[in-house]
Amino acid sequence: MTSSSMLTKKDWSAHARRALSPTEIVTRLADLQGWALSGDGAAVAIEKTYRFANYYETISFVNAVAFIANAQDHHPDLSVHYDRCVVRLNTHDVKGISTTDLECAARFDALLAASE
């Protein structure tokens, strides 16, 4: 058995991750405005479309998301367009949605709240 004190930060986050139940996901999504479930089974994810005035604002947001995602070692799928970015989060390791997905979603939302 591995002691938690012997795990590295990266090992610990993988060790602590688990797929959330549908009830847990719905409950936590209620706290995140604009996020919705998409897909099912191993392809289940949470998804949100962020809208912007122009391409520059969209790319600025994408760069900030990349910075946060890299720091969290958790990388969303992004679909980038002129005036919007679709962010899709799931945890491949657990074949579902984990607390890491929901934490990243809240951090991405905070980017826009900070700029208002």
UniProtKB/Swiss-Prot annotation:
GO terms for molecular function: 4-alpha-hydroxytetrahydrobiopterin dehydratase activity. The keyword Lyase applies. Its EC number is 4.2.1.96. Keywords: Lyase. This is Putative pterin-4-alpha-carbinolamine dehydratase. It catalyses: (4aS,6R)-4a-hydroxy-L-erythro-5,6,7,8-tetrahydrobiopterin = (6R)-L-erythro-6,7-dihydrobiopterin + H2O. It holds the Pfam family Pterin_4a. The keyword Cell membrane does not apply. Belongs to the pterin-4-alpha-carbinolamine dehydratase family. One of its GO terms (biological process) is tetrahydrobiopterin biosynthetic process. InterPro entries: PCD_sf, Pterin_deHydtase.
